[in-house]
């Protein structure tokens, strides 16, 4: 059997050992003659052929077995023990059964039994994947049975005993079981809290944030025939003052498109002297955030249409705390608005009242706007210029009023709103007191000719 493995194609080659070939080869004299020249030392070499064949016959069979079967198998002791246990009929085997299985399967372990059997015992006791099962039957024999832990069957990769994943430990198995249970529970119950609820929360947050902008624009878009929106504006805006002061600024242009054209068309039809102030800021109701809201967005929508008519100079519009409005052009005189709607209508010329007078106001509400703003005539298609970059006109000659820097940025406006809010909460001002802490100043680009007043509109500020 082993000679067939080592048969060679050319037995006459010099490097081939003769006894590795078939034995009948030595009886053939013709084939041996080719080796006569190198082996001329032996005159009668044919007489050695039968003797060589017989004398070395037993040795020939054992010699090729040494390099093949005496090589150590590439399996670990754990793999050898696992093979023995899995080949047992009951998946359990004694220590002697493990020894016998290894020696029958691998001839390498037929020698040096003391060394590798000691290693087998160490691996059985040190590895948790092998479980010792005591004998419970009355069968003859000694020694306990060894079996595999049920969780260690996947210890080797793809069933190959050459590669083991990692050292088996019961702690790792218990952790893996807990992880599997948690994962299984997470698959059943996990999608509801982990996936759907955050989406639902996100939807709720978006719905709670997005209506703020439409609510602000809806409150601030004052139509000439909608008085209820004016009454609701301080309450609805007061709930979100911080959002209104910041978010109302970018929305001034969309708001101006829906409101300013209608309002200007109404203002064109009415005479200049008969226009009464628009009720815009209810100051007595205590709704502080209504000041920045009404003057940042709605009033800018009215006046920004006329901003394109200004050439070089510009006016400044100041709303004081006690419902006093100052609109200046190039006149050195002090122009103040009447404090209430009744005074405005009584002090003005008796004529056809503007439709803006029909807006209903709550009790004690004061409005601050003079008719000079409504004398603007501008086309609705013109684009509203942003009022942040407008340099204010020279209005330092006006006494009794404090004016801020002529070029205002939005943080300064916010600081004025905060100081204005603090001024309202700290002390009640008298009617003639107007200071920088209780005023919000917003510059508007406008031509001086638009803000010029005729003599009947000049009111003395000391009157208030």
Swiss-Prot record:
Could you tell me which SUPFAM superfamilies the record lists for this protein? Winged helix' DNA-binding domain
Which UniProt keywords are given for this protein, alphabetically ordered? Answer: Activator, Developmental protein, DNA-binding, Nucleus, Transcription, Transcription regulation
Database matches in PROSITE patterns: FORK_HEAD_1, FORK_HEAD_2, FORK_HEAD_3
Biased composition annotated in UniProt, kind: Polar residues: 230-258, 351-366
Any Pfam family from its record, for instance, is Forkhead
| Main localisation | nucleus
- DNA-binding region, as residue ranges, is located at 72-166
GO biological process terms, alphabetically, are: insulin receptor signaling pathway; lymphangiogenesis; mesoderm development; positive regulation of DNA-templated transcription; positive regulation of transcription by RNA polymerase II; response to hormone
Could you tell me where the Basic and acidic residues compositional bias lies? 171-186
Family matches, as InterPro entries:
Fork_head_dom (IPR001766), FOX_domain-containing (IPR050211), FOXC1/C2-like_FH (IPR047391), TF_fork_head_CS_1 (IPR018122), TF_fork_head_CS_2 (IPR030456), WH-like_DNA-bd_sf (IPR036388), WH_DNA-bd_sf (IPR036390)
Write out the annotated subcellular location. Nucleus
Q: Which GO cellular component terms are attached?
A: nucleus
Molecular function, one GO term: promoter-specific chromatin binding
Q: Where is this region: Disordered?
A: 168-196, 220-258, 341-366
Its biological purpose: Transcriptional activator. May be involved in the dorso-ventral patterning of the mesoderm.
Q: What is this protein called?
A: Forkhead box protein C2
Supply the source organism's classification.
Eukaryota, Metazoa, Chordata, Craniata, Vertebrata
**Gene from which this protein is expressed:** foxc2
């Amino acid at each position: 059997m082993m000679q067939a493995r080592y048969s060679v194609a050319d037995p006459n080659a010099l490097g081939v050992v003769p006894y590795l070939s078939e034995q009948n080869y030595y009886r053939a004299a013709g084939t041996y003659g080719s080796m006569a020249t190198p082996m001329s030392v032996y005159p009668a070499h044919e007489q050695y052929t039968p003797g060589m064949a017989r004398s070395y016959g037993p040795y020939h069979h054992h010699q090729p077995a040494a390099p093949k079967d005496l090589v150590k198998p590439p399996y670990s002791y754990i793999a050898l023990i696992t093979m023995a246990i899995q080949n047992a009929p009951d998946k359990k085997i004694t220590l002697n059964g493990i020894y016998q299985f290894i020696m029958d399967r691998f001839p390498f372990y037929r020698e040096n039994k003391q060394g590798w059997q000691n290693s087998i015992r160490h691996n059985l006791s040190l590895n948790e994947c092998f479980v010792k099962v005591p004998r419970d039957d009355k069968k003859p024999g000694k020694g306990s049975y060894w079996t595999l832990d049920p969780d260690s069957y996947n210890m080797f990769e793809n069933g190959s005993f050459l590669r083991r994943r990692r050292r088996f430990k019961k702690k790792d198995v218990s952790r893996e079981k807990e992880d599997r249970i948690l994962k299984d529970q997470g698959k059943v119950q996990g999608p509801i809290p982990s996936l759907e609820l955050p989406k639902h929360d996100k939807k709720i947050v978006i719905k709670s944030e997005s209506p703020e902008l439409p609510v602000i624009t809806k409150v601030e878009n004052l139509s000439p025939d909608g008085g209820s929106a004016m009454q609701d504006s301080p309450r609805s805006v007061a709930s979100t003052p911080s959002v209104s002061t910041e978010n109302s600024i970018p929305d001034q242009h969309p708001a101006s498109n829906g409101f300013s054209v209608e309002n200007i068309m109404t203002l064109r039809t009415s005479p200049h002297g008969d226009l009464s102030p628009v009720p815009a800021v209810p100051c007595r109701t205590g709704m502080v955030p209504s000041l920045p809201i009404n003057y940042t967005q709605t009033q800018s929508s009215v006046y920004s249409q006329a901003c394109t008519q200004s050439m070089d100079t510009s006016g400044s519009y100041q709303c004081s705390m006690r419902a006093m409005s100052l609109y200046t052009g190039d006149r050195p005189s002090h122009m103040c608005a009447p404090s209430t709607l009744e005074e405005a209508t009584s002090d003005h010329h008796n004529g056809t009242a503007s439709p803006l007078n029909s807006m209903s106001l709550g009790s004690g509400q004061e409005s601050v706007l003079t008719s000079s703003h409504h004398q603007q005539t501008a086309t609705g298609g013109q684009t509203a210029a942003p009022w942040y970059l407008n340099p204010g006109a020279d209005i330092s000659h006006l006494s009794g009023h404090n004016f801020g820097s002529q070029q205002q940025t939005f943080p300064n406006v916010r600081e004025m709103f905060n100081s204005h809010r603090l001024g309202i909460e700290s002390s009640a001002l008298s009617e003639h007191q107007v200071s920088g802490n209780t005023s919000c100043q917003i510059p508007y680009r406008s031509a001086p000719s638009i803000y010029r007043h005729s003599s009947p509109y000049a009111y003395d500020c000391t009157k208030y």
